[in-house]
Amino acid sequence: MEFSVKSGSPEKQRSACIVVGVFEPRRLSPIAEQLDKISDGYISALLRRGELEGKVGQTLLLHHVPNILSERILLIGCGKERELDERQYKQVIQKTINTLNDTGSMEAVCFLTELHVKGRNTYWKVRQAVETAKETLYTFDQLKSNKTEPRRPLRKMVFNVPTRRELTSGERAIQHGLAVASGIKAAKDLGNMPPNICNAAYLASQARQLADAFSTNIITRVIGEQQMKELGMHSYLAVGHGSQNESLMSVIEYKGNPNPDAKPIVLVGKGLTFDSGGISIKPAEGMDEMKYDMCGAATVYGVMRVVAELQLPLNVIGVLAGCENMPGGRAYRPGDILTTMSGQTVEVLNTDAEGRLVLCDALTYVERFEPEVVIDIATLTGACVVALGHHITGLMSNHNPLAHELIGASEQAGDRAWRLPLGDEFYEQLDSNFADMANIGGRAGGAITAGCFLSRFTRKYSWAHLDIAGTAWRSGKNKGATGRPVALLSQFLLNRAGLNGDD
């Protein structure tokens, strides 16, 4: 799908369709008022007859409006004008894209980017429109034998901006939006792949292909079980013992900073390509969704693609910690004591708390890069879902400025995160009679005790942990990976690169 920006009057557009907003109750947006005036009150007369109230998501498609060059006008309900916020704006764009796609409008000029969204500029509105459009049109049908496509799918969308001065900002927003959307799609595609295809070797192959596609800036190395053993990554290795698929850790290194000595930003993604729970096996219901336990690694892969496509002037390292947790004759057991790469020992009380056992060694491994910051991303705890639902990602950190940066980026990107504490009391829940710590700390505060566990392996650098167990995928009728938090981390890196889109 092609995107562009322009600045022009609605009555001069010869597009197949013009998209304008209507507020509740039956109030025309400024652009809709212009069209109404040119059409001698045609649109307002329809509204007076009750054809459209203006509630969020309502639509009315008009054909051959008097004195208008465009074939059609799509009126889209935007709710109450003063209440139009980020969430409603995205809903309006989503409804617009679906309507255009379903009604055979192959091209359109969209004036919704001229609406006033509280606290948001033109760059944000155009970029969010691009990302939302790509998200709305996303399908995962690679493994279907019969694929259905719209008869006349939407091919081209032009976003109108109020003044010519904002064209440059709009063009930059499209560039950034397309890159972020590409990263989100890559993460979703990986997440939606079935576990009989997407194992640690598949993750490694994708990481290598990324290096091939962006060979100027990216080098990928894959660390297998033999090298992990030599490195002392016994905790990581233990989790994969029950599986016939080899555990593989893929390290994607991007160099974009002109200063070769600049410290890298390191992203570490949990890549459990299937999590049965191991000996502490999960219930059968919903176990199919445990293919999504690698969405942390999928996020890192998606973000590395964004970084490479935008050629950000940063050094970024992405680690995909690939593994599979299965029961078997060689599987690790409750009661085992593991020696981690850091030398600390862990008593295994539950083999279904395996993600932290993989991550702790990966977090120790990345010390060698002398990182600026390290951020791990993991579908780690059901407790985080209980705390924050499926809407907000959990954030923990040992460094206040980093936590504030990530929260700010989450608000900018509309990919929200919320900080949880790492208090001394929670560390006490991890006490073990037989090892330095246990791998679980009981039901109370489970998301926080998991973060406390990881923090014991991050003392040498500034670190943040994103628990995406509630936000990485959807269940039910619309089951599928969400691609979160690719947008959050992409915004964080754009901010670090000084490309935050502020006019």
Curated annotation (Swiss-Prot):
Coiled coil: none annotated. GO terms for biological process: proteolysis. Its cofactor is Mn(2+). It catalyses: Release of an N-terminal amino acid, Xaa-|-Yaa-, in which Xaa is preferably Leu, but may be other amino acids including Pro although not Arg or Lys, and Yaa may be Pro. Amino acid amides and methyl esters are also readily hydrolyzed, but rates on arylamides are exceedingly low; Release of an N-terminal amino acid, preferentially leucine, but not glutamic or aspartic acids. Its EC number is 3.4.11.1, 3.4.11.10. The keyword Phosphoprotein does not apply. Binds 2 manganese ions per subunit. Mn(2+) 2 binds at residues 270, 275, 293, 354. CDD domains: Peptidase_M17. It is found in: Cytoplasm. One of its GO terms (cellular component) is cytoplasm. It comes from the Bacteria. The keyword Iron does not apply. Keywords: Aminopeptidase, Cytoplasm, Hydrolase, Manganese, Metal-binding, Protease. It holds the Pfam family Peptidase_M17_N. Mn(2+) 1 binds at residues 275, 352, 354. Gene3D superfamilies: Leucine Aminopeptidase, subunit E, domain 1 (3.40.220.10), Zn peptidases (3.40.630.10). Belongs to the peptidase M17 family. Presumably involved in the processing and regular turnover of intracellular proteins. Catalyzes the removal of unsubstituted N-terminal amino acids from various peptides. This is Probable cytosol aminopeptidase. It comes from Yersinia enterocolitica serotype O:8 / biotype 1B (strain NCTC 13174 / 8081).
